[in-house]
Regions:
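Short glycine-/acidic-enriched loop or helix-start segments at secondary-structure transitions
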Residues: 59-60, 124-127, 156-160, 183-184
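Nucleotide and nucleotide-moiety/phosphate-recognizing core
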Residues: 34-117, 128-148
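Short glycine-rich anion-binding loops that position phosphate/pyrophosphate groups of nucleotides
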Residues: 53-55, 118-125, 152-154, 179
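Conserved beta-alpha-beta core of the PfkB/ribokinase-like small-molecule kinase fold
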Residues: 147-163
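Single conserved hydrophobic/aromatic residue that forms the stacking wall/gate
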Residues: 185-193
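Short, glycine-/small-residue-rich phosphate/pyrophosphate-handling segment
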Residues: 158-184
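Positively charged, low-complexity intrinsically disordered leader regions
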Residues: 1-40
C-alpha cells in the first residue's frame, strides 16, 4: 500500500532511471484491456471510456485503443479539455483509427461498460454535480458496469475521503503499480446530485 506521494516518488525514480512515460502508459493500457477482455460479459454491449484531462485519461485512451483493436464496440467521452501532451497524442490517434467520440454525455442507463479514467492518483479537483449524478446513475442502473482506473473519481487517494463528499463508487478499481492507501477504507457513500 502506498500514498500518492510514495507512488509519485516511485514513478519519478523509474523515470529518472530511463523508463519512458510512454512505455509505462502502454503497459498499463494493455494490462487493463487484457483484464477486461478476459471478462467478455462486461463488454458484450460495448464500452465507453470517460477520458480525463491528464495522465489517467491517457491510460484510458490506450485501453480504448486496445479494446477497439480487439473488436470491441468502443466510444470515448471527454468532459474536460485535455491538458497533457501525451494524452492529446493518444486522443488524436484514437480519432484517426476510427474510435467514436461522443459529443454529449453518454446514456447512464445503457448496459455498456463504462471505464472511468477521469482523474486518478492525487486528485484534488472538485467534480461537478453533473458528472457525479451521471456516474451514480450508471452505478445504480448497471452495478457491475463501472470500472475505475487506479482511483475512483472523487476519492482522495491518501485517506479514503471523498473530494467534496462525492465519489463514483466504481464496481471495480484497477490499481496501477501498487495498491493505494484509500482502498483500506470503507467504500465512500457518494452524494447524488
Amino acid at each position: 500500500m502506498v500514498s500518492s506521494e510514495q507512488m509519485k516518488n516511485i514513478e519519478k525514480k523509474m523515470f529518472s532511471m530511463g523508463m519512458p512515460v510512454e512505455a509505462l502508459k502502454e503497459k498499463v493500457g494493455i494490462g487493463i484491456s487484457s483484464w477486461i477482455l478476459d471478462r467478455q460479459g462486461l463488454i458484450e454491449n460495448g464500452a465507453i471510456v470517460l477520458v480525463g484531462p491528464g495522465h489517467n485519461g491517457g491510460d484510458g485512451l490506450v485501453v480504448a485503443r486496445e479494446l477497439y483493436m480487439a473488436g470491441v464496440d468502443i466510444s470515448i467521452w471527454c468532459p474536460f479539455p485535455l491538458k497533457k501532451e501525451l494524452t492529446q497524442k493518444h486522443f488524436d490517434y484514437a480519432i484517426r483509427i476510427g474510435i467514436e467520440t461522443l459529443e454529449h454525455k453518454p446514456d447512464s442507463n445503457s448496459n455498456s461498460l463504462w471505464i472511468e479514467a477521469l482523474f486518478g492518483l492525487g486528485q484534488s479537483r472538485i467534480i461537478s454535480d453533473e458528472i457525479v449524478h451521471l456516474l451514480n446513475t450508471k452505478k445504480k442502473s448497471s452495478p457491475d458496469k463501472l470500472i475505475s482506473i487506479d482511483v475512483p473519481a472523487g476519492l482522495d487517494s491518501d485517506n479514503g475521503n471523498t473530494v467534496s463528499n462525492i465519489s463514483s463508487k466504481a464496481s471495480s478499481t484497477l490499481c496501477l503499480g501498487l495498491f493505494k492507501t484509500c482502498l483500506l477504507y470503507t467504500s465512500p457513500s457518494p452524494r447524488d446530485a
